[in-house]
Amino acid sequence: MVVDRAQQPQVVALIARLNRAGQVEWCLPKGHPEGAETLEQTALREVAEETGIQGRVITALGTIDYWFSVPHKRIHKVVHHFLIEAVGGRLSIEGDPDAEAIDVAWVPFDELDERLTFPNERRIVGAAAQHLAAQLQYDCQRADPE
């Protein structure tokens, strides 16, 4: 999950994909490791490919574990989510080698519940919001130690 902390209010990059029924699903960027990549390296590469944004991993947010079916096969998937701070790039789907994303958008935190298709990704957003709020409180306490 990539957040642009420089924008106020803070915004999160979401991608839109077409599901097998041809319906648009808005979701967090994700993908699978290539070669000997670490999970963090995979997250940063996938964010860059699917959104055009370069990032820096702040913390792990949790995992989502689910099953889906394709003809004659059930597939188990575990997605490791990280809170990633945007540090450069430009929002674009042009770099997506799989051309899975059909759109990308910066979405304010208060609109994510409505925009995200999957409830389990809303849980990840909640964990990110808690982390960012705690970090803001810590930063404020350091700035004003009284």
Model-based region annotation:
Residues 33-123:
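Unchanged
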Residues 114-146:
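Charged phosphate-binding loop/patch that engages nucleotide di/tri-phosphates or the phosphate backbone
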Residues 27-30, 73-75, 94, 110-111, ...:
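Short, charged/polar low-complexity linear motifs in solvent-exposed/disordered segments
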Residues 11-13, 39, 60, 129:
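A generic structural signal for ordered secondary structure
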Residues 24-27, 102-105, 126:
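A short, polar/proline- and glycine-enriched secondary-structure boundary/capping micro-motif
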Residues 1-28:
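N-terminal strand-loop-strand
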